[in-house]
């Protein structure tokens, strides 16, 4: 029953219309990351998350994309990404970035402080975290200035028509995998030993964003340069895209699970 619900939910979420600007990882990708993260939680933490959310974690995976244009949540419109400076370093401490608010929420809820919050505030904070942690592992959700990094402002091609790299990488989780279920995506994710999981979960959202920026520079950009024709990609090229995406999904899922555990684990 639970697996069937998740399958139905993923199909329903994927059917929602979300603009390219709004949707890091697209709807399916966010749902997959949230589903995988929930599967990694121990029963105690999972139960507390569901208690405050009144739903599963994947249920709220794309909430921020829908809420960003609705008051009073328009304030979060720019929290879906974080700036990179001219020296390829993440910008720290800027309140209009998502990494700033991930760390703010982690600090405000740490050491049992969530118990002093209203249930509604805990819920909204969880909804932010569920989405933003995923966002900051999407290679195109780091902001490169056109002035300092003009090379990253270009177009790909899809059957001869221009397509932005943002549009491609947002949907890369489901690229040539449209029929995959949430369970299939979870089975595809490499599971880590507790020791390796803790190592991956270390650091701040700024560290993770820096890592994502480096992934873009070192792997995504070389793999899909300007003018790449998506419809004519070789099996090797597709495999390269999948290897990049699979690693980012793994990182996002483990880190989201880690953040939720640090908040709720007694």
Annotated model-derived regions:
Residues 23-132, 139, 144-266:
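N-terminal, motif-rich segments that launch catalysis or mediate targeting to/interaction with membranes
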Residues 1-27:
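Bacterial Sec-dependent N-terminal signal peptides
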């Amino acid at each position: 029953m639970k697996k069937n619900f998740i399958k139905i939910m993923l199909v329903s979420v994927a059917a929602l219309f979300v603009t390219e600007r709004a949707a890091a990882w697209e709807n399916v990708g966010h749902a997959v990351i949230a589903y995988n993260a929930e599967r990694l939680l121990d029963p105690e933490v999972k139960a507390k998350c569901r208690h405050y959310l009144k739903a599963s974690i994947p249920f709220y995976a794309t909430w921020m994309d829908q809420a960003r244009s609705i008051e009073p949540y328009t304030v979060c419109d720019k929290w879906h990404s974080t700036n990179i400076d001219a020296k390829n370093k993440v910008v720290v401490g800027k309140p209009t970035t998502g990494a700033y608010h991930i760390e703010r929420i982690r600090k405000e809820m740490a050491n049992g402080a969530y118990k002093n919050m209203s249930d509604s505030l805990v819920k909204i904070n969880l909804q932010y975290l569920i989405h933003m942690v995923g966002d900051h592992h999407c290679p195109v959700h780091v902001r490169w200035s056109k002035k300092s990094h003009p090379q990253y402002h270009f177009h790909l091609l899809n059957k001869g028509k221009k397509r932005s790299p943002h549009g491609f990488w947002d949907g890369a989780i489901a690229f040539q995998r449209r029929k995959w279920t949430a369970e299939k995506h979870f089975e595809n994710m490499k599971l880590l030993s507790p020791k390796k999981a803790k190592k991956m979960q270390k650091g701040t959202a700024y560290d993770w964003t820096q890592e994502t920026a480096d992934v873009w520079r070192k792997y995504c950009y070389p793999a899909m340069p300007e003018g790449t024709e998506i419809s004519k990609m070789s099996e090797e090229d597709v495999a390269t895209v999948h290897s990049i995406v699979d690693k980012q999904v793994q990182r996002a899922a483990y880190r989201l699970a880690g953040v939720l555990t640090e908040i709720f684990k007694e």
